[in-house]
């Protein structure tokens, strides 16, 4: 929760059963404008229930597994909500898009508008452990794989 508040969140909700109810209780049963769901299968239904009518659910990950295919009428049932599944390939498919978007990210970092919260660092030789920690949700923020150790030696 601390990381979320430090990043500017007004309110933090822990995902799981009852998440949509917590969200709606917090904002007078209106739902939220946008839900960014990086968990996937385990949270998708709650994400649909937490968003306001005509709101957007952006499904950008599948940490708990892929979301099952859905009937489009489900979006209507929840108030004509919009569902998107953005991917880097779709946003960089046209010539020059990757460079333009990469340049925008670098500029945002240089301007201080985009910051990284590196919470763990692993030598490259421990990449499998880093991957396990990600899968087991033992990490928050960003992790770094080091190609060289502090002495400049390659791992």
At which residue positions do the language-model features occur?
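Glycine-rich phosphate-binding loop and adjacent beta-alpha segment
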Residues: 42-113, 147-155
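Terminal peptide-recognition signature
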Residues: 4, 35, 47, 105, ...
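Residues in well-ordered alpha-helical elements
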Residues: 20, 45, 73, 125-128
């Amino acid at each position: 929760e601390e990381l979320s508040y430090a990043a500017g969140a007004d309110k933090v909700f822990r995902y799981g059963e009852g998440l949509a109810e917590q969200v709606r209780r917090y904002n007078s049963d209106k739902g939220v404008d946008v839900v960014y769901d990086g968990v996937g299968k385990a949270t998708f239904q709650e994400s649909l229930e937490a968003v306001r009518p005509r709101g957007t659910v952006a499904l950008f990950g599948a940490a708990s597994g892929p979301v099952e295919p859905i009937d489009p009428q489900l979006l209507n049932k929840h108030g004509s909500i919009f569902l998107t599944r953005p991917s880097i390939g779709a946003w960089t498919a046209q010539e020059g898009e990757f460079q333009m978007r990469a340049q925008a990210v670098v500029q945002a970092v240089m301007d201080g508008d985009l910051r990284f919260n590196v919470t763990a660092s692993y030598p490259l030789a421990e990449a499998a452990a880093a991957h396990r920690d990600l899968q087991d949700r033992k990490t928050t923020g960003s992790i770094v794989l080091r190609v060289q150790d502090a002495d400049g030696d390659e791992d």
